């Protein structure tokens, strides 16, 4: 597929999402494409295929030309345990943590598996962690010494977005993204966007994530519920500081007009 999409002599003539239109009583997930190749003509490499002409046009104008210009580069996965310190005080957890006790990651169900997490803060330096328990978002606390503090955004502001969201429809609204403060972490249920020194920049990033433009660009690669880091590759990175060409003090609708 990558070879064909990089071939300047290749083009798509027609896409049909419902394969049964062309092949009766046949289910082909993803649909059917009618393609054409002429070695004597150059149509320009497709790179990324979408079935929407308008979206193809937007993508050619606005999509990042390299990963450094993509919001994907500012997306970070869940926090992790400092297992050496955890097992020193609580060797019993080695039997319940995955990969025979070697899995550092705050997995989706970690609140149920490891009782070191508490509903109330026990000490001033405890890390507040956002996760899901019994199908509800909950905040729990864990002593800082049991958490790897080298994580990219643990000590800074960030925006959290659910790692599984919607159904993959183009431009669909993201499920309640939230701004998280320094010394607050998150489980595998979420991805973290940004690592900001000041709250204002995180709030600006939140507005961007809610914008129709951002959701449309996300929809280029997000075709399922999965909202992992790579699906954000076509979303352009923005300057979220006060020096930006975009006036972030405006409403999301007004920011969309600037984008």
Residue spans of the language-model regions?
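C-terminal substrate-recognition regions of SAM-dependent nucleic acid methyltransferases
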Residues: 21-259
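Conserved Class I SAM-dependent methyltransferase catalytic core
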Residues: 1-21, 34-36, 205
